Each structure stands twice: as structure tokens, then as C-alpha cells.
Design a protein with these regions (language model features):
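OB-fold single-stranded nucleic acid-binding module
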Residues: 2-84
Length: 84
């Protein structure tokens, strides 16, 4: 997927990489990087995953879940996201 929008959610402590500019778009697919995942990205010298992946095409591995009527994959490890 191409990351068209990327943002940190202050109230939920997740960082989102979205396939659409508007995260409410019914076509949006979200990659949610957990607080643990953000710490692990810092360990591999990626301090801002949102900025690092925005505009890039990525491949993500993990279990797809539906949260708030939107499909997403929660990421806990940097190896789950690959720039392609």
C-alpha cells in the first residue's frame, strides 16, 4: 500500500499509516504502530515512523483486524513493515 497519510494519535498512543488521506474514507486501510512498536523503531534509528514511511509504498505483515469499522494491522515490530 502507499502511505498517503501518517499521524500520531495522542489520545490512543498509536501511530497510524493510512492508505487514504482521510482516515474515515471507507477504502482506508490503516497500519497502527503500537507504543511498544514505536520504541522498537527508535532502537533501529527510525525516530519518526510516520515521517519515514509517508509517501512510500510498504508491505506489512500481521493479522488484519477491524476496529471502529476500519480494517487495520497492529504493528509491534519494525520487521513487520517493509518499504518496497
Amino acid at each position: 500500500m502507499v502511505v498517503k497519510a501518517a499521524k500520531n494519535c495522542q489520545r490512543c498512543s498509536l501511530m497510524f499509516l493510512d492508505s487514504e488521506e482521510d482516515h474515515h474514507d471507507s477504502k482506508n486501510f490503516a497500519v497502527a504502530v503500537t507504543e511498544t512498536g514505536k520504541g522498537k523503531f527508535r532502537e533501529v534509528k527510525i525516530d519518526d515512523p510516520a515521517g519515514h514511511f509517508k509517501g512510500r509504498t510498504i508491505r506489512v505483515t500481521g493479522k488484519v483486524i477491524v476496529k471502529d469499522n476500519q480494517p487495520q494491522i497492529e504493528v509491534d515490530e519494525p520487521r513487520q513493515i517493509e518499504a518496497v
